[in-house]
């Protein structure tokens, strides 16, 4: 939320993972590692140490601590008991934008200098992965550091103003300290929103403020929250009361006082903060100098390249990504045509295609059973299925997974938006959010005892690309009795995903207008201009968002193609998926660079 967190991109608003909204489609250990020197499962031919470099371990843990303590929402989202991680003294704050120091790169250069002071050959294989990932991350941040004013936490559907109430509702109370800190954060919220409004005013003065239509939409989302949050039965009141009542060791009188304080903080600070933001946005409406995608702004195309590099870490140009998307569209359309030519009844069957299991708990149970044949075993953890409160259903994604605390891996929450998810499509949605998607990948990664800093620099393209890959994979589990029908539905959905990423790329890198989007999707049978309008505004508001999901999935698909080609009959889905999961969330260049060594080992077995 402040300057430092702008570089580490894991602010509280990003501590959840959401499934894409497609209107035209039918995070652990203490700083002292548990297994020093145990780096089994890592494939490397580079010179390395057989044991852990303790100085490097201290460095990355110190870097993690410095970052998560800059605001308490982030700190609490990552850990319930900071003292177990050696964190005892921290300010309870939401943080602030450092408007005077936004262009100061000394923070990044200092981190790079410290990182490069380590001899990579003295690091263990696991530490070398951390080193490489951190080096790529910091170099990318430094290269594009002059574009800081493009960054904003306000965008439709996934913006901070939408996610913050959900983060507050998920704030865990394990002891009285949590209650006190939560109330202090609520009381700090108006100050934070003032800082956010001031930052947007700075962006406006420099020509980077959002289009009027987007500002109006975000103001509307804020006003909807204000209207609902002030009522006595507001979910921020009821969830607080429920969590507080479940705590032991607090007297009834103290609980009553805390409840009164919460009501006062919601109305006197949180709602006030949202009003400060809406008033600020209304004043700035009409000040935008540019229209459309990022490429219409000075250096906008460069910033879009930064977004792709940041989320994917894949050495490809915009033109190469564009070509990849075209090839996947052609390939999936050809698959559909071939299947329907083989069995003409598939066309009519496809119109009635659906997943037979529609109850969330049953879906996750079925997925956990079926993935055992295709994915390595992960840790056994618990999870809760919850529903988005009605006040936010029009604003948020169809579903989302909240990352668990590092010391509370059994507390996993999946939220379903009843307005955004049809019951017949709940199966792939929960494959994305649950098994083998976010929940499974997150807890698998945690079980590998990674360096904690990796949670803060995890590329979104890996995280969301993996979940999208799993979402598509789940079509093979549909109980239709007709595998060809499942493949047809999978290819259809894959095509739609590619169309969205193609428009994201077109709008933000190639200068597509709304009419270009309308014409493009019409060629594929989507003639509703309202859909094109929604797509256009969504991609102008949140550039690169669709690309990280879709190009991330394509990255894993390209990895699989290469692995199949190199290993031949030795290829297996469980082993391939284990390679990806054992590496953890890293840039795609790292996955491709190490693939040949892994394939050699597989072929020799």
Residue positions per predicted region:
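Bacterial N-terminal signal peptides that target proteins for export
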Residues: 2-15
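Compositionally biased, low-complexity segments enriched in small residues
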Residues: 5-7, 36-40
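Hydrophobic core
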Residues: 16-21
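C-terminal motif of bacterial Sec signal peptides marking the signal peptidase cleavage site
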Residues: 22-26
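Bacterial signal peptide processing site
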Residues: 28-30
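Elongated, amphipathic alpha-helical interaction scaffolds
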Residues: 32-34
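N-terminal maturation segment of proteins
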Residues: 39-605
């Amino acid at each position: 939320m402040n300057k430092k967190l702008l570089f580490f991109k894991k602010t509280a608003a990003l501590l959840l993972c959401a499934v894409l909204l497609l209107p035209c489609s039918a995070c652990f250990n203490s700083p002292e590692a548990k297994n020093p020197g145990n780096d089994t499962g890592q494939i490397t031919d580079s010179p390395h140490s057989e044991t852990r470099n303790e100085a490097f371990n201290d460095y990355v843990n110190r870097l993690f601590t410095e970052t998560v303590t800059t605001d308490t929402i982030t700190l609490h989202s990552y850990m319930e008991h900071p003292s177990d991680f050696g964190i005892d003294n921290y300010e309870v704050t939401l943080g602030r934008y450092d408007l005077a120091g936004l262009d100061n790169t000394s923070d990044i250069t200092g981190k790079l200098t410290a990182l490069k002071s380590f001899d990579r050959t003295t690091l263990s294989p696991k530490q070398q992965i951390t080193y490489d990932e951190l080096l790529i991350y910091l170099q990318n941040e430094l290269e594009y550091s002059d574009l800081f004013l493009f960054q904003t936490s306000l965008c439709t559907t996934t913006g901070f103003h939408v996610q913050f109430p959900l983060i507050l509702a998920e704030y865990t109370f394990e002891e009285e300290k949590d209650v006190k800190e939560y109330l202090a954060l609520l009381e700090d919220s108006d100050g934070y929103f003032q800082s956010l409004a001031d930052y947007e005013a700075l962006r406006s003065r420099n020509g980077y403020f959002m289009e009027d239509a987007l500002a109006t939409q975000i103001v509307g989302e804020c006003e909807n929250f204000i209207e609902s949050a002030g009522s006595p039965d507001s979910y921020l009141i009821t969830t607080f009361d429920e969590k507080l009542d479940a705590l032991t060791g607090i007297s009834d009188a103290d609980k009553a006082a805390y409840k009164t304080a919460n009501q006062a903080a919601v109305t006197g600070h949180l709602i006030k903060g949202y009003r400060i933001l809406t008033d600020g946005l209304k004043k700035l409406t009409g000040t935008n100098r540019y229209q459309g995608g990022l490429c219409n702004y000075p250096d906008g195309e460069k910033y879009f390249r930064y977004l792709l590099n940041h989320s994917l870490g894949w050495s490809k140009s915009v033109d190469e990504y564009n070509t990849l998307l075209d090839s996947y569209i052609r390939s999936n359309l050809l698959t559909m045509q071939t299947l329907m030519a083989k069995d003409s009844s598939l066309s009519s069957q496809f119109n009635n295609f659906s997943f037979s299991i529609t109850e969330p708990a049953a879906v996750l149970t079925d997925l956990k059973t079926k993935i055992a044949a295709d994915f390595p075993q992960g840790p056994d953890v618990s999870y809760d299925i919850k529903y988005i409160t009605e006040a936010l259903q029009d604003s948020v994604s169809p579903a989302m997974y909240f990352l668990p605390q590092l010391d509370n891996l059994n507390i996993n929450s999946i939220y379903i938006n009843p307005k955004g998810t049809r019951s017949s499509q709940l199966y792939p949605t929960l494959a994305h959010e649950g098994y083998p998607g976010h929940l499974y990948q997150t807890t698998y990664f945690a079980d590998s005892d990674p360096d904690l800093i990796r949670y803060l620099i995890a590329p979104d393209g890996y995280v969301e690309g993996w979940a999208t890959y799993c979402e598509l994979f789940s079509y093979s589990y549909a109980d239709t009795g007709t595998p060809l029908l499942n493949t047809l539905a999978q290819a259809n959905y894959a095509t739609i995903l590619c169309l969205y990423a193609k428009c994201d790329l077109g709008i933000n890198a190639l200068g597509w207008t709304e009419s270009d989007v309308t014409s493009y999707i019409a060629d594929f049978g989507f003639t509703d201009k309202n859909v094109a309008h929604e797509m256009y505004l969504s991609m102008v508001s949140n550039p690169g968002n669709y690309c990280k999901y879709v190009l991330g999935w394509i990255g894993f698909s390209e990895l699989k193609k290469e692995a199949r080609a190199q290993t031949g009959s030795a290829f297996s889905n469980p082993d391939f998926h284990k390679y990806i999961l054992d590496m953890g969330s890293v840039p795609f260049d790292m996955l491709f660079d190490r693939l040949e060594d892994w394939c050699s080992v597989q072929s020799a077995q």
